[in-house]
Amino acid sequence: CDRRQRQMCIRDRLYNSQESVKQIQTGVVLEWDTKLGEVNSNAYYSNRDFVGLLPFTNGGYVELNRDFSGAEVNIKDKSQNFEWIVGTSIQNQKDDRKRFENNEGYKGAVTLDQIESFRSYGAFALVSYNKENYSIQSGLRFDLHKISLDDNIGIDQQYVDYSKSLKAFSPNVGLIYNLNRNDEVYINYGESYETPSLSELSANPNGVGFNEDLSPMNSSGFDIGFRKKSQNLSYSIAAFYIDTKDEIVRYELEGFEGMNFYRNLGTSKRVGAELEASYNLGKPGVLNASYTQAKYEFENQGVSGGLAGIPKSNFTLEWLYGYKNFDLKMDLKYVNSLYADNNNEVKVPSYLLSNIALKNKFNLTGFFLEVGLHVRNLLDEKYFDNIRTNAFGSRFYEPASLRSFILSIKTAF
């Protein structure tokens, strides 16, 4: 550890900071045709068992067992000018969350024991009217969320149970106009609604129970752009504007280093432009590039500044090359500086990252062999990663990995 990280490394060793995860998941997808149209359905289930040791005593030993399941069914059809799809979905998440004292790596007394449930019901419809030169799309989604908490510990026999229902409509509308066979312009408008997750709600700075001061986010915005596609070149240019109320942001508290808490941050605005392009070089391969330039700002109780954790600009360049059984991928990524805190006092420097990956396939008698080499951070750039916005004790980031090599071998008989 360097000087900046030495104190935290000592705490990590003292409290035996670590985590382990066991997970299973399964799912099924069914499709069939009816007189009304094509029906698509899916169902899924996963279970996640998590144990984490954080570098503090009170609640620093975490056990979480999560059941997550859901299903969706929709039907779609199209005629000469119309396309439509309607559907419904359900999701259910149940978290058995326990926290104990972390007595220097050993499980101590229980500090939190609660069952958290989040059930969502959704219904949606999307219709598109298509003509030769233009297309109009419109959609509407309705969501109903039921959130509950059962406290199993009860401090001084005071059990903190919780139940709440939230609902929202999310409309959207868009227009695409074809200038000619290869060029088109478009404009979209939409509204969205995002409830806090169970993990965000359960991170209550006041102790057990949910953080009832945490509200859902509401966003509205539009984007307008131009797309072109020719034989060798395709590109798109877009401008966007998003207005969000009650932005959810993370922060940390003294004595709970490494644990995330969440709060609402007034209003925020995202205004910017994006450029994406792809060029077919022929035998030399394909070049892909993307660039984003934007402003991400917030205002909260008369205080304004830049949103933490988001760079104002970034650029990516990628080269793909293939010849017979050989494949090569090189990429270059530039990320501008960003603020690590809402006060805009700590700035994380910009960096330039490069990677290269090569692989070759061999068809040998009786079996197939693929050998690959991936070099990450090819130029050995020193930069910071794992950004923790609004962290306590200046623990905003960690040094990222320097140049590393990954050798892979895959075979099939």
Q: Where are the predicted features?
A:
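Single conserved hydrophobic/aromatic residue that forms the stacking wall/gate
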Residues: 1-10
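Face-selective signature of the C-terminal outer-membrane beta-barrel domain
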Residues: 19-154, 228, 233-241, 286-288
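Residues on the lipid-exposed face of transmembrane beta-strands in outer-membrane beta-barrel proteins
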Residues: 26-32, 71-77, 123-129, 140, ...
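Transmembrane beta-strands of outer-membrane beta-barrel proteins
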Residues: 39-43, 84-88, 136-140, 171, ...
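Outer membrane beta-barrel strand-and-loop segments of large Gram-negative receptors
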Residues: 64-76, 118-124, 211-215, 221, ...
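Gram-negative outer-membrane beta-barrel transporters
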Residues: 78-81, 129-132, 145, 239-243, ...
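Surface-exposed extracellular loop regions of Gram-negative outer-membrane beta-barrel proteins
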Residues: 92-103, 146-155, 176-223, 234-235, ...
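C-terminal beta-signal and adjacent terminal beta-strands/loops
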Residues: 193, 243-245, 287, 337-339, ...
